[in-house]
């Protein structure tokens, strides 16, 4: 059998979705969906996730310990713009700190800007289905 070797620049990593792991984002359509009785069989909620938003340093340390050099993460629009035109600068600064910690750990961030969840206010305006919403 011929020996196979990965390229030295191969990306080994982790991929996550913010709605599933971050916790604390109550301004998205998925949060509202989870609050509707009967939508989730056991009644659980995505609101807490696994608290990655607050425990990211521990998570990134574990990734590094496992030999990961890449992390595909998402940025939930609803966390950064919870109301139309109103940006949460504290959340933006926190996300910047997360990216800086990844850099410190020499883990390459691969950013997903749209991972299905949208702000509730956007959906109520008709979301992507209304031409006037798209600039």
Q: What is each model feature region?
A:
Residues 22-25, 60-135:
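Substrate-binding cleft and catalytic face of glycoside hydrolase catalytic domains
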């Amino acid at each position: 059998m011929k020996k196979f070797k990965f390229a030295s620049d191969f990306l080994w990593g982790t991929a996550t979705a913010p709605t599933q792991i971050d916790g604390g984002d109550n301004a998205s359509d998925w949060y509202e969906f989870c609050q509707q009785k009967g939508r989730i069989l056991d009644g659980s909620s995505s609101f807490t996730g696994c608290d990655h938003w607050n425990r990211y340093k521990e998570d990134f340390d574990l990734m590094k310990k496992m030999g990961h050099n890449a992390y595909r993460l998402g940025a939930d629009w609803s966390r950064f713009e919870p109301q139309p035109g109103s940006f949460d600068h504290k959340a933006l600064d926190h996300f910047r700190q997360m990216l800086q910690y990844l850099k410190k750990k020499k883990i390459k961030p691969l950013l997903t800007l749209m991972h299905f969840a949208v702000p509730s206010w956007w959906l109520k305006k008709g979301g992507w289905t209304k031409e006037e919403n798209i600039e």
